[in-house]
Swiss-Prot record:
Propeptide position ranges: 17-54
A GO cellular-component term linked to this record: extracellular region
Entry keyword Secreted: yes
The UniProt record lists the keyword Disulfide bond: yes
Protein name: U13-lycotoxin-Ls1a
Tissue: Expressed by the venom gland.
Length: 120
């Protein structure tokens, strides 16, 4: 049974390689026509636009202070004092600090966690 399985595997591998070579040689001989994109004319007129710099940084991106981070509860976490700073998750207190300190990217509301509230 094992020998039969090995023989079938070898035959299948040979078949796959030979059919791939046929397609490659037919394409090189221009026997197969390349597929044409129907919408290529639509996108040809559009010029790629340069990405504009965002006013705030997403999580994991470089920052200088808490006001650079996009999320309300995001804080600017720095390694070795002021080096290698990036935006990370903060907490409710971070949001309150940003509300009082930041002029740009100022939080409108600060989300509170439901974990500490008593039920009943």
């Amino acid at each position: 049974m094992k020998i039969l399985f090995v023989l079938i595997s070898i035959l299948y591998a040979v078949y796959c390689f030979s059919s791939e070579e046929d397609v490659d040689s037919a394409y090189l001989a221009n026997e197969l026509e390349p597929v044409e994109d129907i919408n290529s004319e639509q996108y040809a007129a559009l010029e790629p636009k340069e990405e504009q710099e965002r006013s705030c940084a997403d999580m994991g991106q470089d920052c200088k202070d808490d006001c650079d981070c996009c999320l309300n509860i995001a804080t600017c976490n720095c390694w070795f004092g002021r080096y290698f700073c990036s935006c990370t998750f903060g907490d409710y207190q971070t949001c309150l600090r940003k509300k009082g300190k930041c002029k740009r990217n100022r939080p409108q509301s600060c989300p509170r966690s439901n974990l500490n509230r008593k039920k009943g």
